[in-house]
């Protein structure tokens, strides 16, 4: 696997720059300061936008957002092992400490605990963020330990793997319990680097996570998905851009895209799929997502107002270097020192709700939700002329039910650029919009991976339960050809 400064910082969850006390690992019970536990856990939240621990930007590559500029290494899509140990060891364990310390009579009223917020709000927020991590990990791999996870203190070092179906059910219940605990009359301290201590926004994320899971049941357990979605939608998810889950960097702890802008633009570039789709749709977000400026401070290499000047790289072709000087670059706004990385946005949640409405799962107007999702994305990126865009033939909400569902899926993909890559990949696996092809036959594959593979470390450390999970879910073969439980088409 390649190594570089980019690999060490851009895609490494534990090397985010100088966060001061944030980067001091507080993951020891003897340092029982729940605010530190929480902040440290939050530094892992953007891993599913720009994935952690790998130079390989698969969370943006599998979706047709990113390609390689100079070499064909990750475009082959054959580096597919995914390890979960860091997530269990750091964010998930930290969040468990928060729950335990706020539940224990001996600790819950100490200053080290209460300075972060009320016991109920801390527990509710920690459970919500745990569910966020577990949802993504199971959507990446399939069965993982959840119910018996984090029990090393109880001498359970080899937890059983839960099925995706059971995990979704368990997380939905835990999230509902957490939702009921939230007290909006209180707040969390500034140690909450995601929502600035705003409990109402954590409640909206809680309901949104339940919706994101429920919609994936459309092909495997529709009645269950419908019931869960309706309950979550009634509770109220993220519908306004100001409530989106965003990771915010600052000048003291700059965005890794800023710190590594030269390497990033040298090694990776916009994918042809997203560039050409935006041009084909006459989508003004083209000028927000991409740039013709190779490096900070340099002059553009074309007319920035001309859509034809923006060219993306084909995914997985062997001779990428032949096209390196022709393709465009990532937007300067993404690589600013005080840059933002979107995770779960109002655009996504509105468009997920539009799908639910179109399926008849909720009593809401699908077109209104669809248009609200597109408008939220335009607002997020500062794009103009959204009404003209919504009235265009390719975008206007019209046609058969199948055509409307395809339009919803397409707008989710167009708005998902550089946001939660695992969610975008889940959409493509489930809905097949758009169809992402790779540069076959040169790279020897015919489709994007259906899942990541368990790492060798997972197999070695929990062999019996690992083998049982692989046998039950994937016919005994740990590969990328088998599908996650909810992916059946």
Feature annotation, model-predicted:
Residues 50-58, 142-145, 226, 421:
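Beta-strand acidic-aromatic groove motif in beta-rich domains, primarily in extracellular
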Residues 12-14, 259-282, 286-290, 300-303, ...:
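Long, intrinsically disordered, low-complexity segments
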Residues 1-13:
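Sec-dependent bacterial lipoprotein signal peptides
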Residues 52, 363-364, 415, 435:
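Residue-level detector of short coil/turn "hinge" positions at structural boundaries
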Residues 377-379, 389-393:
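C-terminal beta-barrel architecture of Gram-negative outer-membrane proteins
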Residues 14-70, 78-81, 89, 97, ...:
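Membrane-proximal, proline-rich intrinsically disordered regions
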Residues 31-34, 66-129, 133-384, 398-405, ...:
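Structured, solvent-exposed acidic/aromatic patches
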């Amino acid at each position: 696997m390649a190594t570089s400064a980019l690999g060490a910082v851009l895609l490494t969850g534990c090397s985010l720059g100088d966060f001061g006390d944030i980067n001091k690992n507080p993951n020891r019970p003897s340092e029982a300061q729940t605010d530190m536990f929480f902040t440290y856990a939050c530094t892992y939240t953007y891993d599913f936008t720009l994935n952690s621990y790998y130079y390989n930007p698969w969370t943006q590559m599998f979706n047709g957002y990113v390609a390689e500029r100079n070499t064909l290494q990750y475009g082959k899509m054959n580096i597919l092992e995914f390890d979960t140990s860091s997530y269990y060891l750091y964010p998930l364990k930290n969040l468990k400490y928060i729950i335990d310390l706020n539940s224990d009579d001996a600790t819950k009223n100490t200053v080290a605990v209460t300075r972060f917020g009320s016991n109920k709000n801390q527990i509710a927020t920690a459970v919500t963020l745990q569910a966020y991590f577990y949802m993504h990990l199971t959507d990446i791999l399939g069965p993982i330990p959840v119910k018996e996870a984090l029990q090393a203190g109880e001498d359970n070092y080899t937890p059983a793997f839960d099925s995706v179906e059971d995990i979704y059910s368990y997380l939905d219940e835990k999230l509902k319990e957490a939702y009921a605990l939230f007290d909006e009359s209180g707040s969390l301290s500034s140690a909450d680097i995601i929502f600035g201590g705003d409990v109402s926004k954590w409640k909206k994320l809680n309901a949104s996570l339940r919706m994101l899971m429920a919609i994936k049941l459309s092909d495997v357990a529709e009645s269950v998905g419908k019931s869960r979605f309706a309950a979550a939608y009634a509770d109220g998810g993220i519908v306004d851009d100001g409530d989106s889950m965003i990771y915010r960097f600052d000048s003291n702890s700059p965005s890794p895209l800023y710190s590594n802008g030269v390497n990033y633009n040298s090694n990776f570039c916009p994918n042809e799929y997203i560039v050409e789709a935006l041009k084909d749709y006459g989508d003004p977000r083209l000028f927000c997502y991409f740039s013709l400026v190779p490096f900070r401070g340099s002059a553009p290499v074309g007319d920035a107002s001309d859509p034809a000047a923006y060219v993306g790289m084909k995914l997985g072709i062997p001779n990428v270097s032949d096209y390196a000087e022709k393709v465009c670059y990532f937007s300067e706004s993404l690589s600013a020192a005080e840059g933002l990385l979107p995770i779960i946005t109002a655009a996504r949640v509105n468009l997920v709700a539009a799908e639910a409405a179109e399926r008849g799962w909720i009593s809401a107007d699908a077109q209104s939700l669809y248009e609200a999702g597109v408008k939220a994305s335009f607002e997020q990126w500062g794009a103009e002329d959204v009404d003209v865009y919504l009235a265009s033939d390719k975008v206007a909400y019209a046609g058969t039910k199948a055509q409307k569902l395809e339009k919803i899926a397409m707008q989710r993909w167009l708005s998902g650029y550089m946001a939660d890559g695992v969610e975008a990949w889940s959409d493509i696996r489930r809905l097949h919009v758009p169809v992402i092809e790779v540069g076959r036959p040169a790279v020897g594959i015919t489709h994007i991976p259906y899942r990541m593979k368990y790492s060798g470390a997972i197999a070695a450390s929990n062999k019996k339960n690992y083998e049982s999970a692989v046998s039950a879910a994937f016919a005994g073969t740990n590969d990328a050809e088998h599908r996650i439980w909810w992916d059946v088409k």
